[in-house]
């Protein structure tokens, strides 16, 4: 029991639940205050990103008087807001994309195998829980964790797999991939 905590904690590492396939990461904890007649009532707000490392990811926000309860609420909110993101070869993005939320902008670039996750702060948590292994990301503008996570999700929402592009254009995936200039022609459509 000495090395294992039963509740909460601020270790910022991945906490895997016993009976779940999801991995969750605590992105940010903020102490908030509500001003009442008798003074200030303090609480905590938590931002959590959750994913199955196979292409599903979500984020949630929770507020409570205690940190573990705020994290639990944020995790439940993230589980309700899961989205599926198509990955190329199960390790990177299909194409370069940009996203924005408020004053925060993010640019995400697909990367060759072995590059790793080159991203800062909240974006790294999203990519690790999503299952992306190779990506280069840059954030410009707001460094607020909430805006960065929402901008990253906005970018991921605009990503298209070759299969969906081919279906939209009413052509075959092989025809679409043969048109690619340079790069690898044997891209696996997911």
From Swiss-Prot:
Pfam families per the UniProt record, alphabetical: Ribosomal_S5, Ribosomal_S5_C
Gene this chain is encoded by: rpsE
GO cellular component: small ribosomal subunit
Domain notes for this protein: The N-terminal domain interacts with the head of the 30S subunit; the C-terminal domain interacts with the body and contacts protein S4. The interaction surface between S4 and S5 is involved in control of translational fidelity.
Family statement: Belongs to the universal ribosomal protein uS5 family.
Protein name: Small ribosomal subunit protein uS5
Subunit structure: Part of the 30S ribosomal subunit. Contacts proteins S4 and S8.
Record-linked InterPro entries: Ribosomal_Su5_D2-typ_SF (IPR020568), Ribosomal_uS5 (IPR000851), Ribosomal_uS5_bac-type (IPR005712), Ribosomal_uS5_C (IPR005324), Ribosomal_uS5_N (IPR013810), Ribosomal_uS5_N_CS (IPR018192), Ribsml_uS5_D2-typ_fold_subgr (IPR014721)
Species, as recorded: Rhodopseudomonas palustris (strain BisA53)
GO MF entries: rRNA binding; structural constituent of ribosome
Superkingdom classification of source: Bacteria
Keyword Plastid: no
Job of this protein: With S4 and S12 plays an important role in translational accuracy. Located at the back of the 30S subunit body where it stabilizes the conformation of the head with respect to the body.
Matching SUPFAM superfamilies: dsRNA-binding domain-like (SSF54768), Ribosomal protein S5 domain 2-like (SSF54211)
Residue intervals of the S5 DRBM domain: 22-85
HAMAP family (alphabetical): Ribosomal_uS5_B
Lineage, top ranks: Bacteria, Pseudomonadati, Pseudomonadota, Alphaproteobacteria, Hyphomicrobiales
